A protein has these predicted regions:
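N-terminal first-folded block
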Residues: 1-33, 37
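Short leucine-rich amphipathic alpha-helices used at interfaces
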Residues: 31-32, 53, 81
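Short, hydrophobic/aliphatic alpha-helical segments
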Residues: 36, 55-61
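A short, internal acetyl-CoA/4′-phosphopantetheine-binding micro-motif in the GNAT/acyltransferase core
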Residues: 38-45
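A generic "binding-loop/recognition-motif" signal
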Residues: 31, 40, 74-75
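Conserved acetyl-CoA-binding loop-helix of GNAT-fold acetyltransferases
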Residues: 46-57
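C-terminal structural segments of small proteins and small subunits
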Residues: 60-94
Length: 94
């Protein structure tokens, strides 16, 4: 299992937020966290780093009582493929 850290604008794996081996970049609004981009280095690819980043971000979102909007294709796919994240997904009004 990788060690995931929370930075000011991302959850990341590595020694620093400015030079991560993997990262999930987000922007924060009042009640909405938008996942902008996920990047995993070749060194960590295939080890579930992206999923671990998402799990940590979702746990933080739950603790903060916020919701997630995903712009990032990876995060969007992971968030909607099971019910695991249903409680943190923001549903746009019709």
């Amino acid at each position: 299992m990788l060690t995931v850290k929370k930075g000011s604008k991302s959850f990341y794996v590595g020694d620093s937020e400015s030079a991560p081996q993997a990262e999930m970049i987000f922007s924060a609004d009042k009640d909405i966290i938008t996942i902008e981009h996920t990047l995993v280095s070749d060194q960590l690819r295939g080890q579930g780093a992206g999923r671990q980043l998402l799990q940590e971000l979702a746990a933080w979102v739950r603790a903060e009582n916020k919701k997630i909007v995903a712009v990032c294709p990876f995060a969007k796919k992971e968030l909607t493929k099971s019910q695991e994240y249903e409680d943190v997904l923001y549903h746009f009004p019709n």
